[in-house]
Amino acid sequence: MPKTELKSKFREIQLVIFRLRDEEFGVEIGSVLEISRVLDITHIPEAPGFIEGVINLRGKVLAVLALARQFGLQEEKELPKTARIIVIEVHNTSLGLIVDEVPEVIKISEEEIEPTPEIIQSEVNRHYIKGVAKLGARLIILLDINNVLSFHEVEEAAKVAKVVEA
């Protein structure tokens, strides 16, 4: 079989890689609208616990979520200097996700992705993990960004942003 046929057998996926604490995660680049430095976050009283606050991104108010909190990871008192906000679109709503670092954007082949390991017992966790990419010694957890937040949580985040924008 010629090499060109082998190459076309597996689709390449472009991923935005980010870190939360000691873990590496990836999301398909098509879900990412932009990556921004952490802007001044306005904390909103009585906002749902998963919402860190809102930011003004070039005139548009976006709800920002602490992804570490959403995943039940240890929260830091201060964000690292490398922290970024990944702006995504979920259920037709733009949201910001605070992550510790966005070191790279990579291309991988679908054949490098393995199903979610059985060791992950929680159905909630399995619900938003698409699989695991093995890149040498690195394991990158691939997220299904549409399932990280429920539709109800996305609606709540959109309401918070609209109240502030009004």
Give the role of each language-model region:
Residues 1-166:
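An acidic, low-aromatic, low-complexity terminal/linker signal
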